[in-house]
From Swiss-Prot:
The lineage of its organism: Archaea, Methanobacteriati, Methanobacteriota, Methanomada group, Methanococci. GO terms for cellular component: toxin-antitoxin complex. GO terms for molecular function: nucleotide binding; RNA nuclease activity. Probable toxic component of a putative type VII toxin-antitoxin (TA) system, probably an RNase. Probably neutralized by antitoxin MJ1215 or MJ1217. Neutralization may be due to AMPylation by antitoxin. A motif (RX(4)HXY motif) lies at residues 76-83. The keyword Nuclease applies. Modified by antitoxin MJ1215 or MJ1217; probably at least 2 successive AMPylation events occur on Tyr-83. It comes from the Archaea. It comes from Methanocaldococcus jannaschii (strain ATCC 43067 / DSM 2661 / JAL-1 / JCM 10045 / NBRC 100440) (Methanococcus jannaschii). This is Putative RNase MJ1216. Belongs to the HepT RNase toxin family. Homodimer, probably forms a complex with antitoxin MJ1215 or MJ1217.
Length: 121
């Protein structure tokens, strides 16, 4: 399998963040907690985001220290390894309140990287 470049991982992160935002749009916690399909979908998206974040090189993570890379990766680890103890309130709060803001930061990273690509032509 060919090696993926950083932009591919960043676009994966954005795609799964968009999915989370769309899955939980116009939804309250009570509806979320009672909808097994949405809960599982959001958890899976967070797992993929966390895995993709681990592929972001150290120099980029250091350039954007305000982005919670470590926390996103850590959440993935907790979700993967604590399947009987998932804290759905934390999942909900992350999905509803944190992901939309963090997504903006990842969009900035992509814009910065794509700007560098254009300047190097």
């Amino acid at each position: 399998m060919p090696k993926r470049d950083i932009k591919a991982f960043l676009y994966d992160i954005l795609e799964y963040m968009d999915d989370i935002i769309n899955f939980t749009k116009n939804m309250e916690y009570e509806e979320f907690i009672n909808n097994k399909a949405i809960k599982y979908a959001v958890v899976r998206c967070l797992e993929v985001i966390g895995e993709a974040v681990k592929k972001i090189p150290k120099d980029i993570r250091e350039k954007y220290p305000h982005i919670p890379f470590k926390e996103l990766a850590g959440m993935r680890d907790k979700l993967i390894h604590q399947y009987f103890g998932v804290d759905y309130l934390t999942v909900w709060e992350t999905a509803k309140y944190e992901i939309p803001e963090i997504k903006k930061e990842f969009e900035k990273i992509i814009k910065d990287i794509e700007g560098k690509d254009e300047n190097s032509l």
